[in-house]
Amino acid sequence: MILHCPVSLSLSFHLNLRTSRIGNIGVTRVNASQRNHSKKLTKNLRNPRRTKLPPDFGVNLFLRKPKIEPLVIDDDDEQVQESVNDDDDAVVWEPEEIEAISSLFQKRIPQKPDKPSRVRPLPLPQPHKLRPLGLPTPKKNIIRSPALSSVSKQVYKDPSFLIGLAREIKSLPSSDADVSLVLNKWVSFLRKGSLSTTIRELGHMGLPERALQTYHWAEKHSHLVPDNRILASTIQVLAKHHELKLLKFDNSLASKNVIEAMIKGCIEGGWLNLARKLILISKSNNRILDSSVYVKMILEIAKNPDKYHLVVALLEELKKREDLKLSQQDCTSIMKICVKLGEFELVESLFDWFKASNREPSVVMYTTMIHSRYSEQKYREAMSVVWEMEESNCLLDLPAYRVVIKLFVALDDLGRAMRYYSKLKEAGFSPTYDIYRDMISVYTASGRLTKCKEICKEVEDAGLRLDKDTSFRLLQLEKQTMSLLH
C-alpha cells in the first residue's frame, strides 16, 4: 500500500540540504544557486502557528455534546453491538429535554450582582467660605521672612526700645513738656503691657511725675487700656517715692497684682508700717499674696534687730503656706535670717523642701546649712553636709572655706583643716584674718610652734596684726616649748 504524504517546501528544503551535506555535491550547488535567486522566508512564515480562536461565550464548551465521527465498523462488530443494545435498556434523550438543557447554556451564566452605585451627596455650603463672584481668591499660607515682618511685632516688647523711650522722656527740654511729644511718634507700635517697662525705668530714674504722665497718656488710647500691668508699675513707682496721693483709684476693686505692686513699692520706699497694714488687710479679705512679697518684707524688717518679733510672725505665716514658691536666692536669704534668729528647725525644713523640689543647692545654700548646724553645735551633722557638697562637685568660694575650716577647728581635726587651707591657696583666694586666727588656734592646740610662726609671717605679709588673745596664746606655747627644751 502506497501512502502519499505531502511535504512542505521548507521541509523538503531542509531534507535536501541534509542529503547534500552527506554526499551529493551537485545537488548542493543547484540548491545554492536557487537560494541565491529566491528570498529566504522569515522564521514565523516558515513555521507558522495556528492562531487562537476567541472562546464562544454563547455556549458552554464543557457541556456541549461531543461530535462522534463515523468509524468504519466491520460486520462482525456491528452484529455484536446490536446484540448488546438489544439486551440493555439504552437511555434515549427526547427532543424536548435536549432543547431544555441546551437553552440553559445559550446565554452567559449570571454572576453575583454588583452593588448598586452609590451617589454621594454634595457637601453643604459653608457660609464663612463663600465669597462673592468676581473677587480674586486670596493667597493662603504666605510665608513672610523676618525682614518683611511687621515692625510693631519687633518693637513693642523690645526692652532696649522701651528703655530708650524712658531716656527720651527724661531728655525732654523742660518739665512742662508733655510726654506725648515722644510717645505720639510710636503709638502705632505699642501694645498692652509695653509701657510698664518704660514706667518702671522712669521710677529708677527718680521721675515719678513722668511715670504718672505716661500712665495718663496710655489711658487716652483704647488699644493700651485697660491694663493691670501699667497700673501696677505706676503704683509701685508712686509708692516708692511717696507719691500715691497723686493717683486716685479704688483699692477695694484693685487686683492681686496691683496690691502686691503697692506693697513692694512701700517696702522699697521704707513705708514698712503701711506695707504691713496692707498685708494684714489682704489676709483679712482672704487674698493670698505671692511668697515673694513676704520674702521682701522679711528681708527689709530683719535689717532692724528691734523688729525681729515681726520677722518671726511673718516666718510663721510663711510656714503655713502649702503652695510655697521661692527662688533659690529667696530661700537662701530666708535661711540666713533664720540662722540669726536661731530658728534652726525652719532652716532644716527649708533645705529639705528645696531639695525635694528637684533642684540642686548652690554653694551659698550649702554654706548656710553648714553654718546653721555649726551654730547649733551639731558638728557631726555639719560634716555630712560637707561630704554632700563635695559629692556634688560644687566649687567652694571664700565664705565656704571659712565655714568649713571653722568647723574642722571646732572638731580639732588638724589634718582636714590643713588640707582645706592648702586648697584655699591653690584656688587663688587670700585668707582672711579669721581664717589665720583659726589656723593659729588649731596649731596651738596641737603644739605646732613652727607652723604657728609660719602663719604669723603670712599675717605680717598681709599687713594684718594679731589680736591680744591670739598673741597671748602664742607666747604661752613658746614658753612651754622652751621649758621642755631646757
From Swiss-Prot:
It comes from the Eukaryota. PPR repeats lie at residues 290-321, 327-361, 362-396, 397-431, 432-466. Keywords: Repeat. Residues 111-137 are annotated as: Disordered. InterPro entries: Pentatricopeptide_rpt, PROP1-like_PPR_dom, TPR-like_helical_dom_sf. Pfam families: PPR_long. Belongs to the PPR family. P subfamily. This is Pentatricopeptide repeat-containing protein At2g01860. The lineage of its organism: Eukaryota, Viridiplantae, Streptophyta, Embryophyta, Tracheophyta.
